[in-house]
């Protein structure tokens, strides 16, 4: 292909993604676009085609990214090359969204005609604006009885400040308005900039591990050309590989001779480790490298930690294999081996957020058939010690004794909640209970309000989202971003069973809430732990001070049953003998803690 042909081809490329809040119809719209452009025959079509994981289909969310090349013959008679890059919509995967948006020049903003703008729609729109994308608003689900497209149009203009006068009214489900969307992409989304003669610069926006070909990196070519046989270099770590294949997804992987400027496709190079192809990194040629990498790359650090233990301890090695396999596709997942006196051998795992944690747990249980016990999630605390040193604690059991702690800092997030104004009071009460500081509140229209709070991340990781949904009858939508660390009065609470600490039940709590949390958890454990042959005291303690206690009464056999009348001294002798036996049992007896007891720590707020 000569230079003129390359330039002409570049002018026909349109790279775009679809951004939307969960359930506003993003995956359905992607399905319709694939159908309309003839990428798939009707026979191959299935709903949520780009959501390839079962879990994605069931939960109706997109977790992994997918990129598809489509050909579209526009009304002007020209054939255009579309690259549709699917993005996850959930707050845990914000970084992945920002990188996949960086691979585009335009974004279709899908807003539900009945529900209007939600918190995550806004969060993703701001990401798109940061990447200077052309945003095309689409008001979806106009065939719903509750649809009010005019109100939503005003909302888009007032809340986001986009001109929505020519927003497409569509229904992805019934296929209304799809052609208008495709025409708008041709007219409004800019062609890719970039120079085919410059050294190669390719942005990695996703990578997947394949057992036979190694890592398959999804890339967008910003400058230059890449073809099989090229020696490439990763700019963040300097590692070099030889390209074995390049190609595009249409939607099946289709090998090509080369990928040119503006193309979105994949590349394989016998890379063994997904950690070498980190999302956001820049690929260049080893013998003719680019001078500087593309902006915006950062290493992802986990925000939430929890312990995963196999219920059957013989499956420990299987769990390690499962985590290693998941890590191949998920460079944000971190894990290290740990042991607990109560739970045996397991792993301490780090996740991007709560959804990420749930998905990993569910995939281990489903795909690898391992039943898990999970400990309460915790965040990373910065602890300043009295000798002037600092340590980082991600496991409550590792928190030092109070005597050596100068201060403890915990991560705070800025939480944005969008909610109908009938529920403002409920949301504010919930945020206050979670130690939130009120920042701002604004009315988006007559019905909906946006409320912003600063809340400690540790309060959100328990069950903030569930409580928010139940206190607003499911109408609230929620988004958060990390803003930094602040000092707090935090203490570690230990739970003692039969005077022995159970390390897996320790948790970190604010001093002001310590007494009531201790009381709740002791009562809950009393209900959940089965009665033993001897009585079991349950205590909640901060350092050496016991703040709450309860006792599980012993089961006892009626040793007097055989006495009938009998002398009182005979009865007393039998009772004394039983008492002796119970005492001896208590000294050597151990208490089995059921899985529900660990979950009780997570759910303790609900009984307040």
From Swiss-Prot:
The UniProt entry lists membrane topology as: Peripheral membrane protein
The keyword Nucleus is annotated on this UniProt entry: no
A GO MF annotation of the entry reads: ribosome binding
Q: Which UniProt keywords apply?
A: Cell membrane, GTP-binding, Hydrolase, Membrane, Nucleotide-binding, Protein biosynthesis
CDD domains from the xrefs?
A: EF4_II, EF4_III, LepA, lepA_C
Gene Ontology biological-process annotations: positive regulation of translation
Q: Which SMART domains match?
A: EFG_C
Q: Does the keyword Ligase apply?
A: no
Q: Which amino acid positions bind GTP, per UniProt? A: 23-28, 140-143
Q: Which GO terms describe its cellular component?
A: plasma membrane
Pfam name, any one: GTP_EFTU_D2
The family database entries (InterPro entries) matched by this protein are listed as:
EF-4, EFG_III/V, EFG_V-like, EFTu-like_2, G_TR_CS, LepA_C_sf, LepA_CTD, LepA_IV
Q: What class of enzyme is it?
A: hydrolase
Name the domain of life: Bacteria
Known catalytic reactions? GTP + H2O = GDP + phosphate + H(+)
Q: Which residues form the tr-type G domain?
A: 11-193
Task: From the Swiss-Prot or TrEMBL record, state where the protein is found.
Answer: Cell membrane
Enzyme Commission number: 3.6.5.n1
The similarity annotation says: Belongs to the TRAFAC class translation factor GTPase superfamily. Classic translation factor GTPase family. LepA subfamily.
Q: What does this protein do?
A: Required for accurate and efficient protein synthesis under certain stress conditions. May act as a fidelity factor of the translation reaction, by catalyzing a one-codon backward translocation of tRNAs on improperly translocated ribosomes. Back-translocation proceeds from a post-translocation (POST) complex to a pre-translocation (PRE) complex, thus giving elongation factor G a second chance to translocate the tRNAs correctly. Binds to ribosomes in a GTP-dependent manner.
Q: What is this protein called?
A: Elongation factor 4
Question: Which lineage do the record's taxonomy fields give for this organism?
Answer: Bacteria, Bacillati, Bacillota, Bacilli, Bacillales
């Amino acid at each position: 292909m000569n230079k003129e042909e390359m330039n002409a081809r570049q002018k026909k490329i349109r790279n775009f993604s679809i951004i939307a809040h969960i359930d506003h119809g993003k995956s359905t719209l992607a399905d319709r676009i694939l159908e309309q452009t003839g990428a798939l025959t009707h026979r191959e079509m299935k709903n949520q085609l780009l959501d390839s994981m079962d879990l994605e289909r069931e939960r109706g969310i997109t977790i992994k990214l997918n990129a598809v090349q489509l050909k579209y013959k526009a009304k002007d008679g020209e054939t255009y090359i579309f690259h549709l890059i699917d993005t996850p919509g959930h707050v845990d995967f914000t970084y992945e969204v920002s990188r996949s948006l960086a691979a585009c020049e335009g974004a279709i903003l899908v807003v539900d005609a009945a529900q209007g703008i939600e918190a995550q729609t806004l969060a993703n729109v701001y990401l798109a604006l940061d990447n200077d994308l052309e945003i095309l608003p689409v008001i979806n689900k106009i065939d719903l009885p509750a649809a009010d497209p005019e109100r939503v149009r005003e909302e888009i203009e007032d809340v986001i400040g986009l001109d929505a006068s020519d927003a497409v009214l569509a229904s992805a489900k019934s296929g209304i308005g799809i052609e208008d969307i495709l025409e708008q992409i041709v007219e409004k989304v800019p062609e890719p900039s970039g120079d085919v003669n410059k050294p190669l610069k390719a942005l990695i926006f996703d990578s997947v591990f394949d057992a036979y070909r190694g890592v398959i990196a999804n890339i967008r070519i910003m400058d230059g050309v890449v073809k099989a046989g090229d020696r490439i270099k990763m700019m963040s770590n300097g590692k070099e590989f030889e390209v074995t294949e390049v190609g595009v997804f249409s939607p099946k992987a289709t090998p090509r001779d080369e990928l040119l400027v503006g193309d979105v496709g994949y590349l394989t190079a016998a890379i063994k480790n997904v950690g070498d192809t980190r999302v956001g990194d820049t690929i260049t040629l080893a013998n003719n490298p680019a001078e500087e990498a593309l902006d915006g790359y950062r290493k992802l650090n986990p925000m939430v930690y929890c312990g995963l233990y196999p219920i059957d301890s013989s499956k420990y090695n299987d769990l390690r294999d499962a985590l290693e396999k998941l890590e191949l596709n998920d460079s944000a997942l971190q894990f290290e081996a740990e042991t607990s006196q109560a739970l045996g051998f397991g792993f301490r795992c780090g996740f991007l957020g709560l959804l990420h944690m749930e998905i990993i747990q569910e995939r281990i249980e489903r795909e690898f058939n391992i039943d898990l016990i999970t400990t309460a999630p915790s965040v990373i605390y910065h602890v300043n010690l009295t000798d002037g040193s600092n340590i980082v604690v991600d496991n409550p059991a590792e928190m030092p004794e109070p005597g050596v702690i100068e201060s403890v800092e915990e991560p705070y997030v800025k939480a944005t909640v969008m909610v109908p104004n009938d529920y403002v009071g409920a949301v504010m009460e919930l945020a206050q209970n979670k130690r939130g500081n009120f920042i701002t509140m604004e009315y988006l229209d007559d019905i909906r309000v946006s409320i912003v709070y600063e809340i400690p991340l540790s309060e959100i990781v328990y069950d903030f989202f569930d409580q928010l949904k139940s206190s607003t009858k499911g109408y609230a939508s929620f988004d958060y971003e990390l803003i930094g660390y602040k000092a707090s009065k935090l203490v570690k609470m230990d739970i003692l069973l039969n005077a022995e600490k159970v390390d897996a039940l320790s948790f970190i709590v604010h001093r002001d809430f310590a007494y009531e949390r201790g009381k709740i958890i002791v009562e809950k454990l009393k209900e959940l732990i089965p009665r033993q042959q001897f009585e079991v005291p349950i205590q909640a303690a901060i350092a050496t001070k016991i703040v709450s206690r309860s006792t599980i009464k012993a089961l006892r056999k009626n040793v007097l049953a055989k006495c009938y009348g009998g002398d009182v001294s005979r009865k007393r002798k039998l009772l004394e003998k039983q008492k002796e036996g119970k005492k001896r049992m208590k000294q050597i007896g151990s208490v089995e803690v059921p899985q529900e007891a660990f979950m009780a720590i997570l759910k303790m707020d609900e009984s307040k």
